[in-house]
């Protein structure tokens, strides 16, 4: 156990363009959202909640003794959904809340703990996670979100663009096929810790222009002057489920695990 009091909220939106009813995806006999909650329990969080906009998701969670509550269906982001949870639950302003994505059934409990600890230790408004990018294809992939950090470890900017840009290296004929030595390129992992007081404020913030164009909700906080502290981990965490191909891969993994029991 971590020794730090914090809560985990798992936003579980039912609708998904690429994977409808994603939270209910069967993984070895249990819905994916329940698998995520089981991993979160191992972090030692004092409360775990599934926040959903669909009665079937709530019923599935509660059938496996996972607390769930209904939230509005019109939230623009997962952070907006968490703000509603804070309001519904009446949590005190200094409560630490970790936002664990509902499509991460293999999330490492230690990373959840690290993120909560980083928020508590840094005094920042938000804590999140990143790891080094070692593959040029990932660096230039707009689906891989990059973060540039300041000297104090806070985020300076997040982008889908290749940042920072090694001008001289990439100007070479084959420069785009490799990354320079000691290149400070980091991939952002979508795990966040906040205080309830921040989430209450976030709900009233005007969306940022950069948030709209990059389609990155964390840019709203940066635009309004909030601090985001970044914990660097050595390697990429286990992959989540974003596509039908991911879903099939994850099903097979859990089926194999069940067969070995």
UniProtKB/Swiss-Prot annotation:
Pfam families: CTP_transf_3 (PF02348)
Magnesium is among the record's keywords: no
Keywords, in A-Z order: Cytoplasm, Lipopolysaccharide biosynthesis, Nucleotidyltransferase, Transferase
Pathway annotation: Nucleotide-sugar biosynthesis; CMP-3-deoxy-D-manno-octulosonate biosynthesis; CMP-3-deoxy-D-manno-octulosonate from 3-deoxy-D-manno-octulosonate and CTP: step 1/1; Bacterial outer membrane biogenesis; lipopolysaccharide biosynthesis
Reactions it catalyzes: 3-deoxy-alpha-D-manno-oct-2-ulosonate + CTP = CMP-3-deoxy-beta-D-manno-octulosonate + diphosphate
Protein's job: Activates KDO (a required 8-carbon sugar) for incorporation into bacterial lipopolysaccharide in Gram-negative bacteria.
Name the UniProt record assigns to this protein: 3-deoxy-manno-octulosonate cytidylyltransferase
Naturally occurring in which organism (per UniProt): Dechloromonas aromatica (strain RCB)
């Amino acid at each position: 156990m971590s020794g730090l009091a914090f809560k985990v909220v798992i936003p579980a939106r039912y609708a998904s363009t690429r994977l409808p009813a994603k939270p209910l995806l069967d993984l070895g006999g249990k819905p994916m959202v329940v698998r995520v909650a089981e991993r979160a329990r191992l972090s030692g969080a004092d409360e775990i909640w599934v926040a959903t906009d669909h009665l079937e998701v709530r019923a599935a969670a509660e059938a496996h003794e996972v607390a769930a509550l209904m939230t509005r269906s019109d939230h623009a982001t997962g952070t907006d959904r968490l703000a509603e949870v804070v309001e519904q639950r009446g949590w005190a302003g200094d409560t630490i809340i970790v936002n664990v994505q509902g499509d991460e059934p293999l999330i490492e409990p230690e990373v959840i703990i690290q993120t909560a600890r980083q928020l508590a230790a840094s005094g920042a408004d938000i804590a999140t996670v990143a790891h080094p990018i070692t593959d040029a294809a990932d660096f230039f992939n707009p689906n891989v979100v990059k973060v540039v950090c300041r000297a104090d470890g806070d985020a300076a900017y997040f982008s889908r663009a290749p940042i920072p840009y090694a001008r001289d290296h990439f100007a070479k004929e084959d420069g785009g096929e490799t990354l320079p030595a000691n290149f400070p390129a980091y991939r952002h992992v979508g795990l966040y810790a906040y205080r309830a007081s921040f989430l209450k404020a976030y709900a009233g913030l005007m969306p940022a222009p950069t948030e709209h164009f990059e389609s990155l909700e964390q840019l709203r906080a940066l635009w309004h002057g909030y601090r985001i502290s970044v914990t660097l981990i050595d390697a990429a965490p286990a992959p989540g489920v974003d596509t039908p191909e991911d879903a099939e891969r994850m099903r097979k993994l859990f089926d194999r695990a069940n067969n070995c029991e």
